[in-house]
């Protein structure tokens, strides 16, 4: 439900969303997660149950992957940086578009680092005209 509030507030979407895949990761000391993106989904998220000070997730702008003119700004910000660092703290959830390249820096502590990641797709009516479709799903119910 928290993600649907996020999608309504920031993207103005009215669709419901479902989690299609999820997994837990353990990063041992010195482990790193190199740049990657997620396929077959629209949004992704990651939950950080416990992190140490200075932990972050790094997003790389798509434009960084193509040859282009590169001006030297007098200061870097979200718009002119190739990478955007998002600092996280214990209990944080970060949502992002699944196509965005992202990485997790080396675990420089002597303890394991854990996170839970997940992917979303929209349900209901999506698209327009001859590209429109309707996605349904069955909710799992416990007795």
Specify the residue positions occupied by each region the protein language model found:
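Catalytic core of non-heme Fe(II) oxygenases with the double-stranded beta-helix
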Residues: 26-95, 122-134
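Non-heme Fe(II)/2-oxoglutarate
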Residues: 109-143
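Hydrophobic residues positioned within well-ordered beta-strands of beta-sheet architectures
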Residues: 20-22, 43-45, 114-118
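Residue-level signal for beta-strand positions within conserved beta-sheet cores that form or flank
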Residues: 20, 53-55, 112
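Signature of the catalytic double-stranded beta-helix
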Residues: 1-31, 35-38
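Short beta-strand His + acidic residue motifs that chelate non-heme Fe in jelly-roll/DSBH
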Residues: 33-36, 102-109
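A short beta-turn/loop motif at secondary-structure boundaries
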Residues: 16-17, 108-110
